[in-house]
């Protein structure tokens, strides 16, 4: 039976229309922004962006702290008919220079300190630089509002940069449909409700982090963005805001599990989500003991297809190392090297099919052809699939388990790291004659 793609897909900026007018949408240090106010801010920032960058489809980058602009920019750029390029705040100037040049960004909004770190030659010609606070002030002063977008769901909405096994970061192209359906899918299987409060501690520059915001707004829930210095800051924010939903990666979960939690903080949590690396059996047990009233979602995903699987929280105690099954709007196949579908408990490559599959790598036809290939003959969706390079197996109950990777990518703190990029950086110092980078196991 052929699977069908949903037809009720809207442009990404329509997410701000889903919450009640007076419901809190964004909780900042200095203010609580309702959905009604959020709609105005998205509209005005979009109007300002159109005045600054009138060319439809132009790329606009943000390299900012986790505040109003970081949260609003994905929707405002989409409404303005532009393509948002969020830059990880942890990246250094050379990496940012590559992203600006590769994406052909027409505008970079950043903190003054980050703008000051750029050197001559880092910014391509035709790219305007502006401090994020100035952008917000000018958008408010201009007060040029932009109506909700009528963009084609297949139109490009964002480019997210992720490390590759062969050097510099590559840009993953995401459409309005990719991001809308990703938000709908996660809100659905997590069971998010309008009274939920999501603490956004992960970087908004990659899919797992950005979806914290988008899936919450799909459900009409509120988001509390947090740039934390220590794990204790996370606990304090959860207690202060009565947070119900926390998404993290294994290294942060390890740190959080080592802390003493006030009852008021741990009891408000309804759900915990993990991606970016596998949870150990010991860590699962510790989290379940620390948060007995919260459902723990173990998940697997890749930027090229957003999210692939999640494990039913009811099975986490008996299957702590499982990746679970496909999320809504995804089809996950296990494929032999021969191209045939693998049987139960047979190892193969994880292949993700369906409407969450990205549009390829920005201006990189060669690497796109390597990773984005026709779906196997047994696919219910057909079309183009993501061949992940990850080796997995599926048991007789349909649960998936991670086995390993084909390439040399290193996974650290939830980030995919290119060993070649590290080696080239070491050689560029002139202090070493040869360099090799590889990952070391860490039981934590």
Predicted features along the sequence, with ranges:
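Conserved AMP-binding/adenylate-forming
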Residues: 31, 46-94, 201-203, 416
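Gly/Ser/Thr-rich phosphate-binding loop
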Residues: 243-248, 257-319, 331, 338
């Amino acid at each position: 039976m052929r699977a069908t793609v949903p037809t009720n897909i809207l442009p990404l900026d329509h997410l701000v229309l889903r919450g009640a007018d007076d419901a809190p949408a964004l909780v900042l240090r200095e203010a609580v922004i309702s959905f009604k106010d959020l709609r105005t801010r998205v509209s005005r920032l979009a109007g300002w962006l159109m005045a600054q960058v009138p060319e439809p489809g132009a790329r606009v980058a943000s390299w900012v702290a986790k505040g109003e602009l970081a949260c609003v920019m994905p929707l405002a750029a989409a409404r303005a008919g532009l393509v948002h390029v969020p830059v990880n705040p942890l990246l250094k100037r050379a990496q940012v220079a590559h992203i600006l040049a590769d994406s052909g960004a027409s505008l970079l909004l950043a903190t003054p300190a980050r703008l000051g770190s750029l050197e001559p030659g880092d910014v391509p010609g035709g790219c305007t630089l502006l401090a994020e606070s100035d952008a917000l002030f000018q958008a408010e002063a201009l007060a040029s509002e932009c109506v909700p977008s009528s963009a084609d769901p297949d139109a490009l909405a964002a480019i997210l940069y992720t490390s590759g096994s062969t050097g510099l970061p590559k840009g993953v192209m995401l459409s309005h449909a990719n991001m809308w359906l990703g938000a709908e899918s996660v809100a659905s299987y997590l069971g998010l409700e309008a009274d939920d409060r999501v603490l956004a501690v992960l970087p908004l520059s990659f899919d797992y982090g950005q979806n914290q915001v988008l899936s919450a707004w799909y459900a009409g829930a509120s988001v509390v963005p947090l740039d934390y210095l220590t794990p204790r800051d996370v606990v304090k924010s959860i207690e202060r805001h009565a947070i119900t939903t926390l998404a993290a990666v294994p290294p942060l979960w390890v740190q959080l599990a080592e802390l003493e939690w006030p009852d008021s903080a741990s009891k408000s949590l309804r759900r915990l989500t993990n991606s970016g690396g596998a949870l150990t059996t010991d860590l699962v047990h510790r989290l379940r003991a620390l948060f007995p009233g919260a459902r723990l979602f173990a998940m697997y995903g890749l930027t090229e297809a957003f999210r692939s699987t999640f494990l039913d929280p009811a099975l986490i105690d008996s299957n702590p190392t499982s990746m679970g099954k496909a999320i809504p709007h995804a089809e996950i196949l296990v494929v032999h090297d021969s191209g045939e579908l693998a049987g139960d408990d047979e190892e193969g490559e994880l292949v993700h099919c369906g409407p969450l599959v990205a549009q390829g790598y920005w201006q990189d036809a060669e690497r796109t052809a390597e990773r984005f290939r026709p779906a196997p003959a047994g696919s219910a969706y057909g079309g183009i699939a993501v061949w992940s390079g990850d080796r997995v197996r599926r048991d007789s109950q349909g649960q998936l388990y991670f086995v390993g990777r084909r390439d040399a990518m290193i996974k650290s703190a939830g980030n995919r790291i290119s060993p070649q990029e590290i080696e080239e950086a070491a050689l560029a110092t002139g202090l070493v004659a040869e360099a090799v980078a590889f990952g070391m196991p860490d039981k934590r």
